[in-house]
């Protein structure tokens, strides 16, 4: 049976991951550990014979730089790379930039876990002025203001990720294009929820590790068979 493989990967550890802060759409770079994670992932991909025709990332530099490190190591810097805000991390609203332990102390662990892990519940919103500032960012100034988020639940994240998968990435993948997607914990959770038909309760338990390639296998009809981490 013919098997088609897609590579998904969460960016390497970011500076704010290291500092235990909510990051979301804030554009922070990789930590030193994150750089090493991306290089380790590149070595694993090379060891297992993975090479690519096309790559996708978000418009956030922790995703972009992870991808750069991988394709540079694979000597594939020439392949087309498409960046989209639709692959961005979930927008954590007013929590962005705050230390997670401080937020737990203020709101309680149960509430914070609802914000972080549930499918439907969104964290507190940013202000209108903060959203206007976001809308003036050159990465987002061509997007309808009403579409830009004040905050996002995983459900809202899914609603922006899936159209990009269905209309852009999947049609290219169906042409037997070898693709790598470097994105974020929650944008990947959204995609995996769809691909594996995970229900709204079970998705609470899905966590995506930084820096490890996820290999997604599809059959000849491009139906998902299984996915697994490439760790050795």
UniProtKB/Swiss-Prot annotation:
InterPro entries: His_Pase_superF_clade-1, His_PPase_superfam, PG/BPGM_mutase_AS, Phosphogly_mut1
Catalysed transformations (reactions): (2R)-2-phosphoglycerate = (2R)-3-phosphoglycerate
Pathway: Carbohydrate degradation; glycolysis; pyruvate from D-glyceraldehyde 3-phosphate: step 3/5
CDD domains found in the cross-reference section: HP_PGM_like
One MF annotation (Gene Ontology) recorded for this entry: phosphoglycerate mutase activity
Active site, renumbered: 11, 89
Swiss-Prot/TrEMBL site (Transition state stabilizer) positions: 184
Protein's GO biological process: gluconeogenesis; glycolytic process
EC number: 5.4.2.11
Residues binding substrate: 10-17, 23-24, 62, 89-92, 100, 116-117, 185-186
Keyword annotations from UniProtKB, A to Z: Gluconeogenesis, Glycolysis, Isomerase
Disulfide bonds: none
Pfam families reported for this sequence: His_Phos_1
PANTHER family per the UniProt record, alphabetical: PHOSPHOGLYCERATE MUTASE
Function: Catalyzes the interconversion of 2-phosphoglycerate and 3-phosphoglycerate.
Oligomeric and partner information: Homodimer.
Family of this protein: Belongs to the phosphoglycerate mutase family. BPG-dependent PGAM subfamily.
Name assigned to this protein: 2,3-bisphosphoglycerate-dependent phosphoglycerate mutase
Record organism: Buchnera aphidicola subsp. Baizongia pistaciae (strain Bp)
């Amino acid at each position: 049976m013919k098997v088609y493989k897609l590579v998904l990967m969460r960016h390497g550890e970011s500076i704010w991951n290291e500092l235990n802060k909510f990051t979301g759409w804030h554009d922070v770079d990789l930590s030193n550990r994150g750089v090493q994670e991306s290089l380790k992932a590149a070595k694993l991909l090379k060891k297992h014979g993975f090479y690519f025709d096309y790559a996708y990332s978000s418009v956030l530099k922790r995703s972009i730089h992870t991808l750069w490190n991988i394709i540079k190591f694979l000597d594939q810097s020439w392949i087309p790379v498409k960046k989209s805000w639709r692959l961005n991390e979930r927008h954590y609203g007013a929590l962005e930039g705050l230390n997670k332990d401080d937020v737990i102390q203020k709101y309680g662990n149960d509430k914070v876990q609802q914000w972080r892990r549930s499918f439907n519940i969104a964290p507190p919103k940013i202000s209108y002025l903060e959203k206007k500032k976001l809308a003036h960012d050159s990465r987002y100034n061509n997007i309808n203001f009403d579409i830009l988020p004040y905050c996002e639940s995983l459900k809202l994240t899914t609603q922006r990720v899936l159209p990009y998968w269905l209309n852009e990435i999947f049609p290219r993948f169906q042409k037997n294009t070898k693709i790598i997607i470097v994105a974020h914990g929650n944008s990947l959770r959204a995609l995996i929820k769809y691909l594996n038909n995970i229900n709204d309760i079970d998705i609470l338990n899905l966590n995506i590790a930084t820096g490890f390639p996820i290999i997604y296998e599809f059959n000849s009809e491009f139906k998902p068979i299984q996915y697994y981490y490439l760790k050795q």
